[in-house]
UniProtKB/Swiss-Prot annotation:
Protein name as catalogued: Phospho-N-acetylmuramoyl-pentapeptide-transferase
GO cellular component term of the entry, any: plasma membrane
Catalysis: reaction(s): UDP-N-acetyl-alpha-D-muramoyl-L-alanyl-gamma-D-glutamyl-meso-2,6-diaminopimeloyl-D-alanyl-D-alanine + di-trans,octa-cis-undecaprenyl phosphate = di-trans,octa-cis-undecaprenyl diphospho-N-acetyl-alpha-D-muramoyl-L-alanyl-D-glutamyl-meso-2,6-diaminopimeloyl-D-alanyl-D-alanine + UMP
InterPro entries for this protein: Glycosyl_transferase_4, PNAcMuramoyl-5peptid_Trfase, PNAcMuramoyl-5peptid_Trfase_CS
Predominant place of localization: membrane
Topology of this chain in the membrane: Multi-pass membrane protein
Compartments (UniProt record): Cell membrane
Protein keywords: Cell cycle, Cell division, Cell membrane, Cell shape, Cell wall biogenesis/degradation, Magnesium, Membrane, Metal-binding, Peptidoglycan synthesis, Transferase, Transmembrane, Transmembrane helix
Cofactor(s) needed by this chain: Mg(2+)
Protein family according to the UniProt entry: Belongs to the glycosyltransferase 4 family. MraY subfamily.
Pfam family, one: MraY_sig1
Organism (species): Carboxydothermus hydrogenoformans (strain ATCC BAA-161 / DSM 6008 / Z-2901)
NCBIfam families: mraY
This protein's encoding gene: mraY
Coiled coil start-end: none
Length: 325
């Protein structure tokens, strides 16, 4: 019954996103809300200049509609939905400043960081104070290897600090991954399948509906976002997806699994950090360009090949992680 309801939610969300895209994309084109492509990026990206952005609205709308239709109003689901939408709103403001008000850098870095920290606190405090979330992390594979689940106790201070770091870190990591047509949406679609599986195992019906609804919305969005993309998700979508991924982990005590299922996000972020540090110290670059997907682009990989390989890596990590629950 729960699985049937979840699959139905996925289909509803898919069709809402499909219809939403048909309405939103022409409207964005009419308003000339198009992405400005950086000249220092891969040269073949220059032809994408003017492609509508803020497309994250498509799958966020389908998510909200589906959650309401299926009345997934339990406290955990609502807290995750609110946090996801708050991050999406922050991304929307950033996109709006960039493409509508023509402020190239959008929100200032400190403004964006402050908003992310505050919204992360909303989820963290809500989970601990109102949902009875403990300050421990489930240790992956402990049930499989030791016969019983084991947890790593962090204590209040470290738990809050670590959770905020995870929320902010993954919001920005997912944002970094959004640099190739269909990449971020494809990888996150597969990551969400892990959290759907986790929610089902924990009998969290609301979170299960949320995960399937977001998956359906992403499939619908991919119809327009696959190469060659007719729309980009923008920070509106990528920050929201990052918050959803990290928020799911916090609410299901699976934070450590993010290193596995979110491997692509982690590697993309590390490639940027390594590139900056090595260049500042030696004046040389480790990668042709960072994040990592741009390195592969400049190495001759097509966008479709990058999406396929990164998605397969994510799928493998999700399958492995399933045994660790």
């Amino acid at each position: 019954m729960v699985i049937t309801k979840g699959v139905t939610a996925l289909l509803v969300s898919f069709f809402v996103a499909l219809g939403g895209g048909r309405v939103l994309i022409p409207w964005l084109l009419k308003l000339k809300i198009g992405q400005t492509v950086r000249t220092e990026g891969p040269k073949r990206h220059l032809k994408k200049s003017g492609t509508p952005t803020m497309g994250g609205i498509i799958f966020l709308l389908s998510l909200v509609v589906t959650v309401v239709v299926f009345q997934a109003f339990d406290a955990k689901t609502l807290l995750l939905l609110i946090t996801t939408l708050l991050f999406g709103l922050l991304g929307f403001l950033d996109d709006y400043l960039k493409v509508v008000l023509r402020r190239p850098l959008g929100l200032r870095a400190r403004e964006k960081l402050l908003g992310q920290v505050i919204f992360s606190l909303v989820l963290t405090f809500g989970a601990v104070a109102f949902l009875g979330r403990g300050t421990d992390w489930y240790i992956p594979f402990s049930r499989l290897l030791l016969g019983e689940p084991r947890y790593l106790e962090l204590g209040n201070v470290f738990f809050f600090a670590a959770t905020i770091f995870i929320m902010v870190g993954f919001a920005n990591a997912v944002n970094l991954t959004d640099g190739v047509d269909g990449l971020c949406s494809s990888v996150t679609l597969i990551v969400m399948s892990f959290f759907a599986m986790t929610s089902l195992a924990l009998k969290e019906k609301g979170l299960f509906i949320f995960a399937l609804a977001l998956m359906g919305g992403l499939v619908g969005f991919l119809v327009y976002n696959r190469h060659p993309a007719k729309v980009f998700m923008g920070d509106t979508g990528s920050l929201a997806l990052g918050a959803a991924v990290a928020g799911f982990a916090v609410l299901t005590q699976t934070e450590l699994f993010l290193l596995l299922v979110g491997l692509i996000y982690v590697v993309e972020t590390l490639s940027v950090i390594i590139q900056v540090i090595v260049y500042q110290l030696t004046g040389k670059r480790v990668f042709k360009m960072s994040p990592l997907h741009h390195h592969f682009e400049l190495s001759g990989w097509s966008e479709n090949k990058i999406v396929l390989v990164f998605s397969l890596v994510t799928l493998i990590m999700v399958l492995i992680s399933g045994y660790g629950l």
